[in-house]
Amino acid sequence: MRKIIHVDMDCFFAAVEMRDNPALRDIPIAIGGSRERRGVISTANYPARKFGVRSAMPTGMALKLCPHLTLLPGRFDAYKEASNHIREIFSRYTSRIEPLSLDEAYLDVTDSVHCHGSATLIAQEIRQTIFSELQLTASAGVAPVKFLAKIASDMNKPNGQFVITPAEVPAFLQTLPLAKIPGVGKVSAAKLEAMGLRTCGDVQKCDLVILLKRFGKFGRILWERSQGIDERDVNSERLRKSVGVERTMAEDIHHWSECEAIIERLYPELERRLAKVKPDLLIARQGVKLKFDDFQQTTQEHVWPRLNKADLIATARKTWDERRGGRGVRLVGLHVTLLDPQMERQLVLGL
């Protein structure tokens, strides 16, 4: 029996904004395009959701529901950065990772030896690690198949998890509304209800032939899901493109010696993480990131063939001297970009 975890970050874009600017934490905020440009909401925090603001809602409607809504344009580099860090955390537990978007993924931990092989404990530890390292919360679902893991991750949001053991699947399905199954939209749900089908238990009693005539291929999928059948594998994560490590300080730093000391502490962790995916430590580029007390950030990198601490320190010093402008620094990060597989093959052939 497989052990599948679905991890879903809680209002991810908004959560990153609130983490980086605590003044936003207790007020309604949303990420989206402006009303003038007929934008839509990407996500909203929980204070905004209390007013009915939702993802994919037109910005104009959101502002009518919540006139004091703080609308943010979004910082997708920051979201991508956090997403990459989260996926790196996943990789500590399994190589079988299927990202669905920046803020959610499936993990197959069937063969994982972590936490004595307990998927429940692995999910809990992953969520704790995400919060410890990124100050972001995640929800998780654990089940023997993918669609149930995804449904389960929504059961105890935010910052919770829900487990459906193999023994619990039949009872869980009996009362599960069909609208909860991924892929069943409002139109399909209405058609099913017109047939007297509201739950998976109802579909279990329905003849498959009827479902096939009414819904075609989707009818079979619906019938299988209602039986708890989902044979889809977790598709492994695409080849990793970068590895990074960073630290947000409790208090801003103002002296180069403090920054250098942080790099000295970060470097061994970067080396450890890189060695897990590239034991030879060969890379395409390496660089540093500084985030300042006004939440602006700068990244500087250049081509370098192998992870090198002295070069990272020199790059950081140059960045510190040229771009800080007297500002305090709240975050220091180190990262490397991995060689493209085709480029790596060419280098090997060249040798």
UniProtKB/Swiss-Prot annotation:
Protein's name according to its UniProt entry: DNA polymerase IV
- Residues of the active site are 104
Q: Which GO terms describe its biological process?
A: DNA-templated DNA replication; error-prone translesion synthesis; SOS response
Cofactor requirement:
Mg(2+)
- Residues binding Mg(2+): 8, 103
Q: Which Pfam families match?
A: IMS, IMS_C, IMS_HHH_1
EC number(s) recorded for this UniProt protein: 2.7.7.7
Q: Which reaction does it catalyse?
A: DNA(n) + a 2'-deoxyribonucleoside 5'-triphosphate = DNA(n+1) + diphosphate
Relate the protein's function as given in its record.
Poorly processive, error-prone DNA polymerase involved in untargeted mutagenesis. Copies undamaged DNA at stalled replication forks, which arise in vivo from mismatched or misaligned primer ends. These misaligned primers can be extended by PolIV. Exhibits no 3'-5' exonuclease (proofreading) activity. May be involved in translesional synthesis, in conjunction with the beta clamp from PolIII.
Q: Might you report a single GO cellular component term?
A: cytosol
As given in the record, the signal peptide range reads: none
Which intervals hold domain UmuC?
4-185
User: Which keywords accompany this UniProt record?
Assistant: Cytoplasm, DNA damage, DNA repair, DNA replication, DNA-binding, DNA-directed DNA polymerase, Magnesium, Metal-binding, Mutator protein, Nucleotidyltransferase, Transferase
- Comment on bound cofactor: Binds 2 magnesium ions per subunit.
| UniProt source species | Escherichia coli O9:H4 (strain HS)
Q: Which family does it belong to?
A: Belongs to the DNA polymerase type-Y family.
Subunit (UniProt):
Monomer.
What GO annotations for molecular function exist for this entry? damaged DNA binding; DNA-directed DNA polymerase activity; magnesium ion binding
Location(s), subcellular = Cytoplasm
The site annotation (Substrate discrimination) covers 13
Locate the transmembrane regions by residue number. Answer: none
**Source species, domain of life:** Bacteria
